[in-house]
Amino acid sequence: MKKIELHLHFDGSLSIPYASRLMGRDVTSELVSVHAKSLAEYLDKFTLPVRLLQSREDIETFASLLAKDLESDEVIYAEVRFCPLLHTGVLTADEVIEAALAGFRRVPEVKINLILCMMRNFSIEENKEVIRLAKKYRNQHVVAID
């Protein structure tokens, strides 16, 4: 059955096997929270994926793997959300977005658009940067901000 995925977190989609391969060890406990006692504890599980997805190659490769997973699940359209500013350890926010889009383009059978996320703990200027990026890429597969 063909499907549409409208709420998918890029960082939260990093698979345990892929993350473990990147880290060279089992990272299950760092990615899975069976009994999170608070939102902060739950969100802490995003720390490792964000840390692992800092290079153009890693972002692009993971984006293509995510697209392939969606395709195998018969998803024909997806809106993937993430905050590009979280991935700017060595890249610019533009490079982060372009890497994700390049990875998604490797699987043209799934139409994937981005929702750029602002963060509650970011400054007004940082969140304005997310808005600027959304405007810049609005005709290039960025469909919303959150």
Where are the regions that the model predicts?
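Metal-cofactor-binding active-site regions of metalloenzymes
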Residues: 1-146
